[in-house]
A protein has these predicted regions:
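N-terminal substrate-binding region of glycoside hydrolase catalytic domains
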Residues: 33-125, 143-149, 223, 228-229, ...
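Aromatic-rich peripheral "rim/lid" segments of glycoside hydrolase catalytic domains that contact
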Residues: 38, 55-58, 152, 266-279, ...
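Alpha-helical scaffolding within the catalytic cores
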Residues: 50-58, 83-89, 125-130, 188-214, ...
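Aromatic- and acid-rich polysaccharide-binding/catalytic face
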Residues: 71-76, 140, 146, 198-237, ...
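An active-site-proximal structural segment forming one wall of the substrate-binding cleft
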Residues: 115-144, 158-174, 203-217, 278-291
C-alpha cells in the first residue's frame, strides 16, 4: 500500500538528490552486499526527506536494515533509463552495496483506477520500458503490478487485460535478462477474504482470492504485501497459521514486499504503541520461520507523510531516532 510519489516535481527532485548522493558516497562504499541469508531483508526507499544529507543517511542505515532496497512507482518511470528514479536506484546498488527490488505499478490501489488506459499504445510502452530496463540493468528482482488482487476486486475487466499482458512482458524480459526474477504482487489480507477492521468491510473467508495465484503461472515468486494491523487489534491476535497457510496454495518461493504495523495511539479503536510495533516485528519472523521466504521488506524506514495508520509505520521517527521496532528488525533472522 505504498503510495506513488506526489507528482513530477518530487520525482525530479528525487533523481537529483540521488545522483548527488552517489557522487558524495563514491567509491568509499562497498561494491557488493555480503553473502546473504535465506531470507533477504530490507526496506523501501523511504528517507526522512528529499534533502541530500537525508538520502545519504538512508542508504547508510539501509545496510543495517538488510540487503535490499525497494522502489515502487509509476511503470512509466522505467522508460527513463538515463536518470529516472528506478534507474538511479538500480545504479546506486553497487555504490551502497544493496540489492535493488524494482516494483512497477499501473493503477491506484485506493480506487482501482488505471494510471493510464491499458490500450495497445500503453501496453507497448510499458512492455518496451520494462524490457529496456531489464536488458540494461539485469535486476535480480522486477515486480510488475502491486496488490493486483485489489484491481481484480474493483475492475475485473482491467485485471483480465493485465493477466494476459503480464505473460507477454514476462517472456520479453526473460529473453533479455533470463536471471531476473519476475513476478506480480498480491495484498495478503484481502487475498484471505479479510476485509474488516480498517478496511471497513467484513471478514469472510469464503471471499478468499487464492485462485488468482493460478492466473500467473509465469510468476517466479509469489509475493505479498501484509498489514495485519488493519485487521487485528494486536499481534497476539494473529493466528499461528496466518502466514504458513500460504504454503497450502502454492509451492513457489514466497516474498513479502511490504510489511507494516503502526505505532501511534490512533485511529480510535485501533490504538497501537511503539512496543506493540516491535512485538509485531518479532511475531512476524516467528510466524514465518518455516516458510523460507526469499524477501522480507519493511515498508518504511522513516515515518512517511501520509494518512494514518501508515504515517506511524516507520522503524524510525521522523526526527531520526529509532523506535524499538528498529532493533527488533535489525537483529531478526
Amino acid at each position: 500500500m505504498i503510495k506513488l510519489g506526489n507528482g513530477r516535481v518530487k520525482a525530479l527532485l528525487l533523481v537529483i538528490v540521488l545522483v548527488a548522493a552517489a557522487v558524495i558516497g563514491g567509491c568509499a562504499q562497498s561494491n557488493n552486499p555480503e553473502p546473504s541469508p535465506a531470507t533477504l531483508k530490507g526496506v523501501s526507499l523511504s528517507p526522512r526527506s528529499f534533502q541530500q544529507a537525508d538520502f545519504t543517511d538512508f542508504f547508510q542505515k539501509a545496510k543495517q536494515a538488510g540487503e535490499v532496497v525497494s522502489w515502487a512507482g509509476d511503470w512509466n518511470e522505467l522508460s527513463n533509463t538515463q536518470n529516472g528514479s528506478p534507474t538511479v536506484v538500480a545504479s546506486l546498488a553497487s555504490t551502497y552495496g544493496y540489492i535493488p527490488l524494482i516494483e512497477a505499478q499501473f493503477f491506484t490501489q485506493s480506487s482501482g483506477a488505471l494510471l493510464r488506459p491499458l490500450d495497445e499504445n500503453t501496453r507497448r510502452s510499458y512492455k518496451d520500458s520494462a524490457v529496456a530496463f531489464a536488458q540494461r540493468y539485469q535486476p535480480k528482482y522486477l515486480a510488475l503490478g502491486i496488490e493486483v488482487n485489489i484491481l481484480y476486486e474493483k475492475s475485473p475487466s482491467d485485471f483480465d487485460v493485465f493477466v494476459q499482458f503480464y505473460g507477454e512482458v514476462y517472456d520479453a524480459i526473460k529473453a533479455v535478462s533470463p536471471d531476473t526474477k519476475v513476478f506480480t504482487i498480491f495484498q495478503l489480507e484481502k487475498m484471505k477474504g479479510l476485509n474488516g477492521g480498517l478496511f471497513g468491510g467484513t471478514n469472510d473467508s469464503s471471499k478468499a482470492e487464492w485462485s488468482l495465484l493460478d492466473r500467473f503461472p509465469k510468476s517466479d515468486i509469489i509475493a505479498f504485501t501484509t498489514y495485519p494491523g488493519l485487521i487485528f487489534g494486536n499481534p497476539a491476535e494473529i493466528p499461528a497459521e496466518y502466514y504458513s497457510e500460504i504454503k497450502s496454495h502454492t509451492s513457489k518461493p514466497l516474498a513479502f514486499t511490504e510489511i507494516g504495523w503502526h505505532s501511534a495511539v490512533s485511529p480510535a479503536g485501533w490504538e497501537s504503541s511503539e512496543a506493540e510495533q516491535a512485538e509485531f516485528v518479532a511475531a512476524f519472523f516467528q510466524l514465518t520461520r518455516d516458510l523460507d521466504s526469499e524477501l522480507a521488506i519493511w515498508s518504511f524506514m522513516y515515518d512517511p507523510q501520509t494518512f494514518e495508520p501508515f504515517d506511524s509505520m516507520g522503524l524510525r521517527h521522523a526526527d531520526g531516532t529509532a523506535r524499538p521496532a528498529w532493533a527488533e528488525w535489525v537483529k531478526a533472522r
